[in-house]
Amino acid sequence: MFENLRCAVLWSLGYRYSFWHRLAGLKDARLRAEQVMEDIGLARRRDTPAGILSYAEQRALEIGITIASGADVILLDEPTAGMSNTETEEAVAMIRRVTEGKTLVMVEHDMGVVFGLADRISVLVYGQIIATDVPAAIRSNAAVQKAYLGTSLNHD
């Protein structure tokens, strides 16, 4: 698992199949990969092959690879799909932690995940944006409630 992260860090530092590279950069890459492992909660699984990580751990590793690459904009598609409630809560906390100061664009149907992560939400129904606002306003938006619940909770 460590090698997956180290490769992402090396790539972000410009090490692309180059035979001639600075050895000092390799130490920096190792330290950065170890920091990302800690950030995504997988430090204890450092030497575990990625293929035998649990599903939730594999998703965390995918996010870690993105973070290790130095991306300022992170795009996640259903990051918690298929996870248990506990795994989802842990994933949301980890995503919040590692995307702080970055732009996060996410497609997600689990509204608990959306409200747990978003500063701003756009609601898409049949390909049309029906609302864009802060989470509290989206939660009370009659059009959003009708689209997702079949009726408005506002009873207007």
Residue positions per predicted region:
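Glycine-rich phosphate-binding loops of nucleotide-dependent enzymes
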Residues: 1-156
